[in-house]
Amino acid sequence: MDIMQKTEQPDLFDAIIRELEAEEKQKTPQMKQKNNEDSSNVLQRTKLEKPADNDSDQVLPGTETYSERKEFSCIHTEAVSLYDAVYTDCTFTGCSFNKTDLTNTTFTDCTFINCELVMCRIDGTTIDSVQFKSSRLTGINFTEASEYGFSPDFTDCLLDSCVFYDNTLNHDCFINTTLRNTDFTNCRLKNVDFSGSRFQSAGILGCNLEGSDFRSASGYSIDPSANKLKGARFSLPEAASFLKYIGVTVE
């Protein structure tokens, strides 16, 4: 039985977005500098620059209906729409997508390296065999993405305030990735590789985690009675966190 009703999910995500926007308005210059320094430790991102006018590949993504085997570098988009664009086997390096509308956009066999995606709209977006490497994703509601071929992999990334409510992520990867305030409620997470990842206030409830790899992962809080764990692999000392759910104290 679902832990949370499906209809409650949009309210949850709206609350997250409002909180992110409020936090951004309240940040002092010193706080913003610290956040940038924290992110750089995880991402080691390249400096974003505007594309050169004379580079044929350096065009704004979305200006073409279909792009295949193209490389996009250091492109910055803010509050623009890439509606219905199709990208196949493309690589995005050092790009920033801030509040970009990716509704019904299709990404197939694409790779994002040192990229930043902030509060992007992904209603009906196809994310099929897409790899995110050393990238930061903030306030992304993956529940809105198309279920067709949904298969994102994350390596050395930072996911902050993202939602994977009721998503199917079987056999996907979250390797050496920081999962901060990220919700996995009611997800299918069989045989997922979480090795080396850091959980910070991440919600894992009502999930199927059978066969998943949590070895060398840290910070997770998983209730064995509220999740399926058959065949999942854990390592000490983090696995000792299960004891609190059965009323056992280790001194």
Locations of the language-model features?
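Intrinsically disordered, low-complexity repeat/linker tracts enriched for polar/charged residues
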Residues: 5-9, 26, 30-33, 44
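N-terminal intrinsically disordered, low-complexity tails
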Residues: 15-31
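Tandem repeat scaffolds
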Residues: 3-6, 14-17, 38-251
